Amino acid sequence: MKGTLKMKTIKGPAIFLAQFVDDKQPFCSLPSIAKWASDLGYKGVQIPSWDNRIFDLEKASESKTYCDEVLGILQSYNLELTELSTHLQGQLIAVHPAYDISFDGFAVEKVRNNPIKRREWAEDQLNRAAVASKNLGLKAHATFSGALAWPYVYPWPQRPKGLIEEAFDELAKRWKPILNTFEENGIDLCYEIHPGEDLHDGITFEMFLERVNNHQRCNMLYDPSHFVLQQLNYLDHIDIYHDKIKMFHVKDAEFNSSGRQGVYGGFQPWLKRAGRFRSIGDGQVDFKAIFSKLSGYGFDGWAVLEWECCIKSPEQGALEGSKIINQHIIEVTEKAFDDFAESGVDENTNKLILGIG
């Protein structure tokens, strides 16, 4: 470990708006959804860049005036913009043919049914997101890696030699120019470590990071819920990768295996799966330990609620989420708890104590 880590107080609570944007009030415009979030006690919002009902990515990448207007709206409700997200566009950087139809709807209509044009559009979206993030004064950005190797995550039938390496080589080739654009704009690109993506655990992140030559803008969005569902130790993950974790989704989950199903879920709907996402506080994630570790390692980003639950309503989840995150944020100490007993010795005294003076 290099030097001494300085503890930081995590910012929050904030909320990811993707699951809440709707055609009905108060979720259909930026001012109304901002007021709603502020009234619930949130201090920040994370904005999905693909939903023109609340945000125009093209304008944000071309107009500082528009960005100032967005920030002004949020500030009028005592909110900050935490980050932008391109989860849907990032997914389209790499799509295996098996998922081509399923993911095609993530793109604008004019490039659908054309994988090459669709990917070019997605690349443009990511590059615009880098510029927009700079225009908005942000530090980090959330996305998905996309996937070429995911259909082969289970090694049956036996994978051809070199198949996975070829997939990751190609994935890195596609992302390197985008990472360079983020570097030019001073923004960390944070891949959410997520099932369905080639970057779905620590090892796959390392495989990708090596292929992009340890690019300093290649970082992680940490979401413990995805680790619960694959039975990965989400606390050890922080110990290993804390220097790459630049974003944090506060999302809960539970895993209750039985004699009938385990991590694969038996093709069941979310309600009947052994592993399922839950509203914050209703699952098994140890958020006290997570907030302690992240604070201790000096993470000073935002604690952003991502609500997903197959039982509880989003409105109730958002209401409870603000309070729960507030309860978990640690105001880190600036002094040692036993400073009152400091002996006041100096270097010479230390040498005498050790018998080396």
Please provide the spans of the model-predicted regions.
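Glycine-rich, proline-tolerant flexible connector loops at the mouths of alpha/beta enzymes
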Residues: 47-70, 90, 145-152
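C-terminal helical cap(s) of enzyme catalytic domains, especially alpha/beta-barrels
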Residues: 314-337, 341
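Acidic/histidine-rich catalytic cores of soluble enzymes
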Residues: 10-13, 28, 44, 51, ...
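Active-site acidic/histidine proton-transfer and metal-coordination neighborhood
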Residues: 27, 31, 36, 76, ...
